From Swiss-Prot:
Pathway: Carbohydrate biosynthesis; gluconeogenesis; Carbohydrate degradation; glycolysis; D-glyceraldehyde 3-phosphate from glycerone phosphate: step 1/1. GO terms for cellular component: cytosol. Pfam families: TIM. This is Triosephosphate isomerase. Belongs to the triosephosphate isomerase family. It comes from Lactobacillus delbrueckii subsp. bulgaricus (strain ATCC 11842 / DSM 20081 / BCRC 10696 / JCM 1002 / NBRC 13953 / NCIMB 11778 / NCTC 12712 / WDCM 00102 / Lb 14). It comes from the Bacteria. Its main location: cytoplasm.
Length: 252
């Protein structure tokens, strides 16, 4: 099974619609063929309309950074997965450490979101990762495996085959510290083995696993050379057209 590499930018709370259009115009003609590398930008909800319109007809795929687990109702301030699908969004990030930390999202919340995202024909990018304290205590595998088990609860093997899992060690996000490519590979391998234990070998071979945490043009090739790393979830380096292009075109 050859898994298509996926490089996804996570803009977090950055960029406005005007900057979004300028970014897309700067990158859209230089993106790789999606059969070689899938290029994704996950943007704030307020930028998605501009991003989708600007990216139309290009090789850029669009993701949201969050959504709710209900499609409609009295949920002030939330984003509907059904409307994201109608708009043309393909991916939704869930379980990012910033959501878990600042907005107190639990594994149960994240699992409900995963189910709602799949029910609407979208693909979740499920984030997992440990803190520095957990790693220093030697409990990183236990921690990440429990996040994966809880996040995938009740999902079918067919759904999980289409899933993207992003391993983001919290201590490496926006700190300039990167897990070594060996550390990243080791955890991505553990994640794949967990999927195999929960489902079967075929599902584990199909699931795409990204590394996130200070991914930049200088380290992307080394990370992507690892057998269990299928992509990157990229923060700061995805805000600048030149560095984003260097990341998605890492094979050149």
């Amino acid at each position: 099974m050859s898994r298509t590499p996926i490089i996804a930018g996570n803009w977090k709370l950055n960029m406005n619609p005007k900057e979004t259009v300028e970014f897309v115009n700067a990158v859209k003609d230089q993106l790789p063929d999606p059969s070689k590398v899938e290029s994704v930008i996950c943007a704030p909800a307020v930028d998605l309309d501009a991003l989708l319109k600007a990216a139309e007809g290009s090789n850029l795929h669009v993701g949201a950074e969050n959504c709710y687990w209900e499609n409609s109702g009295a949920f002030t301030g939330e984003t509907s997965p059904a409307v994201l699908k109608e708009m043309g969004v393909q991916y939704v990030i869930i379980g990012h450490s910033e959501r878990r930390d600042y907005f107190h999202e639990t594994d149960e919340d994240i699992n409900k979101k995963a189910k709602a995202i799949f029910a609407n024909g979208l693909t979740p990018i499920l984030c997992c990762g440990e803190s520095l304290e957990t790693r220093e205590a030697g409990k990183e595998n236990e921690w990440v495996v429990s996040q994966i088990k809880a996040g995938l609860e009740g999902l079918t093997s067919e759904q999980v085959s289409k899933l993207v899992i992003a391993y983001e060690p919290i201590w490496a996000i926006g700190t300039g510290k990167t897990a070594s490519s060996d550390q990243a590979e080791e955890m991505c391998k553990t994640i794949r083995e967990t999927v195999k234990d929960l489902y079967n070998e075929e599902t584990a071979e199909n699931v795409r696993i990204q590394y996130g945490g200070s991914v930049k043009p200088a380290n992307v090739k080394e990370l992507m050379a690892k057998p269990n790393i299928d992509g990157g979830l990229v923060g700061g380096a995805s805000l600048v057209p030149d560095s984003y292009l260097a990341l998605v075109n890492y094979q050149d």
